[in-house]
Amino acid sequence: MGRFAQGKFTVKNPAKYIGNKVPTYRSSWEFTFMKFCDEHTSVSQWASEAVQIPYRNPITGKHTIYVPDFFIAYGDKNGKQRVELIEVKPLNQTVQEKVGKNKHNQVHWVINQAKWEAARAWCKQKGIFFRIVTEGDLFHNGRRR
């Protein structure tokens, strides 16, 4: 089994980082997204694992908490200020057809759907957006964006 890149991210632009704790990346993709948030001029604020959203786990039936990977505020290409919650996931965990017949993967897909439905509802109440970022968003032609 492969190991994921994990560690503490060193923020270069502390005025932009609004989280209460040192950002921790749990994959190289999260590291890439942190670097993007920290360095991109359009991103005005960002935080790692800063929001807690209650949801019901559809497998256990228990109420629990979902913590999306990122909160970001940025100016879009039209100059409009946007605020989003971001979850970084591999594409094969976001599309049911790509999950396959593996029971473990199917359970995670069902749980993720419940988390993301709760996140969309929470964001709608706050007037912000929820987005899932995959490798297609992070990388272009096999290179980091």
Please identify what each model-predicted range represents.
Residues M1-R145:
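Electrostatic, structured charged patches in enzyme active sites and in nucleic-acid/phosphate-binding
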